[in-house]
Amino acid sequence: MTQLNSFFYVSDNTGVKKIFSIQNITRNSFLVNTTDIILGIIKEISFKSSFKYSEIVYGFVVRLKKTQNIQNRYNYIFNENAVILIDKNFNPLGTRIFGLFPENLKNNNYLKLNSLVLNII
């Protein structure tokens, strides 16, 4: 779990590099867990991005630095907090997803996100 008001790296090819989380939309809590949807502000972009600095976006949390028990006997620790940018209808804004994707996220109802995934733990 991670708290709100923290930075998340974006792991898709939208051109956004880093966002700052404002609100947890999935549940009314200041803690953020994987599979949560957050509201964030863009803090860092690449120079050819179609997004603007300080634009408000939605993000689907994929990876956290906190130790997670994804399967019953394995614990996973990632190096960064990462999100995938989505729109209001939960469709991904990018066309590719970079990095590892935990297996417990495959079981959710986000079929369009699951179809873009290449590396599954």
From Swiss-Prot:
Pfam families: Ribosomal_L14 (PF00238). One of its GO terms (biological process) is translation. InterPro entries: Ribosomal_uL14, Ribosomal_uL14_sf. Keywords: Apicoplast, Plastid, Ribonucleoprotein, Ribosomal protein, RNA-binding, rRNA-binding. One of its GO terms (cellular component) is mitochondrial large ribosomal subunit. It comes from the Eukaryota. It is found in: Plastid, Apicoplast. GO terms for molecular function: large ribosomal subunit rRNA binding; structural constituent of ribosome. Part of the 50S ribosomal subunit. Binds to 23S rRNA. Belongs to the universal ribosomal protein uL14 family. This is Large ribosomal subunit protein uL14c. It comes from Toxoplasma gondii.
